Amino acid sequence: LLLDEPLSNIDQNFKEEIQTKLKKIIKDLKITTIIVTHDSYEAFYLADTCGILLDQKLKQFDTPYNVYHIPNSIEVVKFLNRGVLVPAKVTSPKSLENEELGTITGNFSKPFEIGSTVKLLLQPEDLHHDDKSNLKFDVVDKKFRGTNFIYSLKTDKNFILPVFVHSHHVHQHEINEKFGIKRPIHIEHLVCF
């Protein structure tokens, strides 16, 4: 079954209900289905496997989890538009150093030689808020998403870092306030290019 943008013109509230029903029908009837969509959340919800097609080439074909958390190219990162790439230097098999964020630990998605200069992908859920931290950046934007906020923080080097915070968090920050980042920084998947 081929579905080309089947839910693109449906009201958001109704769309989620239709997605749930569509997924159940596809699973219950065991229909092999290709769904073409520009909505990554829709693709991640409906698919067992996602393919990212850019410039008429298949850039990544993997589980929704891996496409989001372990994108295999800068092109896929830019297509998903969920994070920012910041410069860093690999300091050990499980850590790297960023001039503004300091040491960041985790598991590299692919190996790099110690001393390599890389671009580290930071996604909104990778950094954590901490009012007591001495690592602070200015809030330049704040998006309310119902269950969460996405804060945009500007660094001294003019990078804009997205940070996810649950909307029930006691202290909400406003534009131009300082926002603390929890240290030490640990990111499960260190995705670098």
Residue ranges and their predicted role:
Residues Q56, D62, N81-G83, A88, ...:
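Glycine-centered flexibility sites
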Residues H69-P93, L121:
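C-terminal boundary and immediately downstream tail of ABC-type ATPase nucleotide-binding domains
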Residues L1-E75:
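ABC ATPase nucleotide-binding domains
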Residues T63, E75, K89, K136-D138:
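Residues located in well-ordered beta-strands
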Residues P6, F14, H38-L46, L58, ...:
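A general secondary-structure boundary signal
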Residues G83, K94-F193:
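Non-catalytic connector elements of ABC transporters
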